[in-house]
Regions:
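Conserved active-site-adjacent core of cysteine acyl-enzyme catalytic domains
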Residues: 1-72, 79-89, 93
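Noncatalytic regulatory segments and standalone regulatory/sensor domains
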Residues: 83-133
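Short, exposed beta-strand "edge-strand" segments with a Pro/Gly-rich flavor and a Y/T-containing core
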Residues: 9-15, 77, 107-116
């Protein structure tokens, strides 16, 4: 794709939401929109876009940040009248000897609803939102 220097190949460097969008577009013919939040404390400003995406498109979103450097799969969005939440699935889950069970995924915290106010307030976030048809 030539968006990185040749030294990037076989390195331990990370890719982020922007690169995920490039890969989806280049290899899967799925264009993506990057939505940027300047800080975790401003994620509520992008909530309506994410909520609308799940109503209309129903496909996961990749989310990454700088200081919060753990990538996240966003699989849903909801509100309870006063708080906003994202359903976060950790893409680093590794199948255990028990297989993939609710205990492995939910009870051990690999998938959970997270209040937007609990994201790192000093980290920016990029959300890669696939524009599926």
């Amino acid at each position: 794709m030539e968006d990185k220097p040749s030294s990037f190949a076989n390195s331990k460097e990370w890719i982020g939401s922007v690169e995920v969008g490039l890969v989806l577009d280049q290899f899967c013919n799925v264009p993506c929109r990057i939505v940027h939040s300047r800080s975790g404390s401003e994620l509520n400003q992008v909530f309506s876009q994410v909520f609308k995406h799940f109503i209309e498109k129903k496909c996961p979103i990749m989310m990454g940040g700088d200081l919060d450097c753990s990538s996240k799969g966003i699989f849903g969005a909801c509100e309870d009248g006063k708080n906003f939440y994202f359903l976060v699935v950790d893409p680093h889950f590794v199948k255990t000897s028990d297989g993939i069970t609710e205990k492995n995924i939910v009870d051990l915290g690999w998938a959970k609803w997270i209040k937007l106010e609990d994201f790192v307030s000093s980290s920016f976030y990029n959300l890669c939102i696939p524009q599926v048809k």
